[in-house]
Regions:
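An acidic intrinsically disordered interaction segment
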Residues: 48-74, 111-124, 194-210
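Proline-rich, low-complexity linker regions of envelope-associated factors in Gram-negative bacteria
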Residues: 7, 95, 222-224
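Sequence-level detector for tyrosine residue identity
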Residues: 46, 94-97, 230
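Long, charge-rich low-complexity segments
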Residues: 26-47, 134-172
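N-terminal Sec/ER secretory leader and immediately downstream segment
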Residues: 1-86, 90, 188
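Extended amphipathic alpha-helical interaction segments
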Residues: 79-158
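Surface-exposed polar/charged interaction patches
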Residues: 7, 11, 15, 52-59, ...
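A cross-kingdom marker for long, charged
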Residues: 157-255
Length: 255
């Protein structure tokens, strides 16, 4: 799906260049991506996320487990509502991750406008509804996918907050997030966020990635008492909790 989202960014630009009316999914259509959250299912999802992450980064998984005990999705709900996003809609959940990840990669701070958040949600909905396996997902599958994206967004936001303005750490986080997104087909460095959603960076005059800017391999975890490593963010974005990874699992079962 990430590759489909990347393609939608180019298509959005082509529509603007052709002076065509920009088609954004209507709320009635995106409502197909709503689900009624089950707290029992959420706890099962949390446990599953921790178990998967343990295979990638045992130390990071322990921290993730501690954070998930606080039910971060419930804590995110009022914050996302400020920009018009919901935790019980798959497109909104993907938009929350997409925006948070893009901001990390580009070093952007401050709250996104409701207009931008709404445009990215609709852009996400267009791509999701064009992916039959995801569009036809059961409520349980929608919840699992959405909550995976919300947990990813939480991980990125928490890492950036803990960096406490340290530019070196923030840059390292951005590289890790970009690496994870790239592994699943989403090139965040090639995009810019506008009131119409994401567009190719070149079309807006935004700076291209610097030559040789390919993210370097990051340590999976930092030394105790030292700065943290952010390889877990790359792993989560690329495979551990990514939508592509989850889709293969979720679409293989019912319920």
């Amino acid at each position: 799906m990430n590759r489909l989202l990347s393609r939608s960014v180019q298509e959005r630009s082509d529509e603007r260049d052709g002076a065509a009316a920009i088609h954004l999914t209507e709320k009635a259509q995106s409502a197909q991506l709503d689900f009624t959250p089950s707290m029992q299912r959420r706890q099962a999802n949390y446990a599953s996320f921790v178990e998967r992450s343990r295979k990638v980064d045992p130390a990071g998984a322990a921290g993730l487990a501690a954070n998930l005990k606080l039910d971060p999705i419930a804590l995110m709900k009022p914050q996302l509502a400020q920009v018009g996003l919901r935790t019980d809609n798959l497109a909104d959940a993907y938009a929350a991750y997409w925006i948070e990840a893009w901001e990390a990669v580009h070093g952007v701070t401050g709250q996104t406008s409701r207009e931008k958040a709404d445009a990215v949600s609709r852009q996400s909905a267009n791509a999701i509804l064009a992916t039959p396996a995801i569009a036809a997902a059961t409520p349980a599958q929608k919840q699992e996918l959405a909550e995976a994206m919300l947990v990813q967004a939480m991980l990125v936001a928490a890492a950036r907050e803990q960096a406490n303005g340290d530019e070196a750490k923030l840059a390292e986080i951005g590289r890790a997030v970009g690496k994870g997104a790239s592994a699943s087909g989403l090139d965040l460095r090639a995009m810019t966020l506008t009131e119409d959603g994401f567009l190719p960076a070149k079309r807006t005059g935004a700076a291209d990635p610097a030559p040789g800017a390919e993210p370097r391999a990051l340590a999976v975890s930092g030394e105790a008492g030292s700065r943290p490593g952010y390889g877990f963010l790359a792993a989560a974005g690329g495979a551990g909790l990514g939508a592509a990874f989850l889709m293969g699992k979720a679409m293989g079962r019912r319920g």
